[in-house]
């Protein structure tokens, strides 16, 4: 769902080529209905372009950078050469995610027995303003463990979360590090075991014995910041116990 009528200079856009001429190519902007774009041959590739059809063809989708916007005519000038492969891949992935989000939004509207435009006005536009993209809103709803958006009221929220959790898979991230624990006490092995025992109320983590005196710890979560916070709490807890039990301890990030 795009709430802007026109892109801005510097934006990356997905363009479907509709016509290729000797000195340029025309295309439609997939994310902006009714908006056309033009790529001059000088903006197709770095260096001299002898045959433009070696780079562009009708029906092809490319990612371009907006270099000029004509508000009155609703058309834009575009550059293909100013977009690198990494930017192109990311933009295409983002566009496909938004297409998926639009379909999920239609499902939400259908379940609510409401018109698509009515849903956009009621909560769609607000979610895009809040999260930047509709897909990001669905990701947030899918990852929610408690009440989602507690400061916002609406009978649509439960349905939105339901559709999100059924259709969006949140990939896990992991943060890891190494503990090195030493003790010369007669019961040193038991002390080290106690030091490296992680209280469940702090968080879940995987502890793996690598080889004396190293232990690898991994924290997984769908939220990177939460994973970092959990690891930080675990390290603090283990460090405090090590001091109390007189176990020498070192921690390093992987």
Swiss-Prot record:
Keyword annotations: Initiation factor, Protein biosynthesis, RNA-binding
Gene3D superfamilies to which the protein is assigned, alphabetical: EIF_2_alpha (3.30.70.1130), Nucleic acid-binding proteins (2.40.50.140), Translation initiation factor 2, subunit 1, domain 2 (1.10.150.190)
CDD domains, sorted: S1_IF2_alpha (cd04452)
SMART domains: S1 (SM00316)
Residues in coiled coil: none
A GO molecular function held by the record: ribosome binding
Pfam families: EIF_2_alpha, S1
Limits of the S1 motif domain: 10-81
InterPro entries in UniProt: NA-bd_OB-fold (IPR012340), S1_domain (IPR003029), S1_IF2_alpha (IPR044126), TIF2_asu_arc (IPR022964), TIF2_asu_C (IPR024055), TIF2_asu_middle_sf (IPR024054), TIF_2_asu (IPR011488)
Function: eIF-2 functions in the early steps of protein synthesis by forming a ternary complex with GTP and initiator tRNA.
Sequence similarity: Belongs to the eIF-2-alpha family.
Summary of subunit composition and partner proteins: Heterotrimer composed of an alpha, a beta and a gamma chain.
Designated name of the protein: Translation initiation factor 2 subunit alpha
Organism of derivation: Thermoplasma volcanium (strain ATCC 51530 / DSM 4299 / JCM 9571 / NBRC 15438 / GSS1)
């Amino acid at each position: 769902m795009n709430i802007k009528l026109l892109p801005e200079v510097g934006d990356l856009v997905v363009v479907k080529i509709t016509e290729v001429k000797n000195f340029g190519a025309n295309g439609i902007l997939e994310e902006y209905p009714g908006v056309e774009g033009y790529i001059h041959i000088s903006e197709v590739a770095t260096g001299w372009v002898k045959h433009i059809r070696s780079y562009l063809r009708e029906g092809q989708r490319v990612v371009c950078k907006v270099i000029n916007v004509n508000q009155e005519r609703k058309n834009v000038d575009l550059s293909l050469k100013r977009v690198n492969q990494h930017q192109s891949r990311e933009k295409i992935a983002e566009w496909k995610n938004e297409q998926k989000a639009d379909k999920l939004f239609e499902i939400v509207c259908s379940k609510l027995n409401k018109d698509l435009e009515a849903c956009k006005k009621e909560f769609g536009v607000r979610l895009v303003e809040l999260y930047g993209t509709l897909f990001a809103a669905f990701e947030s709803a899918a990852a929610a463990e408690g009440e989602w958006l507690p400061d916002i009221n609406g009978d649509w929220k439960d349905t939105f979360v339901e559709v999100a959790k059924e259709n969006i898979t949140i990939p896990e991230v992991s943060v890891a590090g190494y503990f090195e624990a030493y003790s010369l006490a007669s019961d040193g092995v038991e002390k080290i075991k106690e030091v490296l025992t992680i209280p469940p109320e702090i968080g879940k983590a995987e502890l793996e014995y690598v080889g004396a005196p190293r232990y690898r710890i991994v924290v997984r979560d769908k939220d990177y910041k939460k994973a970092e916070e959990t690891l930080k709490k675990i390290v603090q807890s283990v460090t405090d116990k090590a001091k109390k039990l007189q176990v020498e301890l070192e921690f390093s990030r992987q």
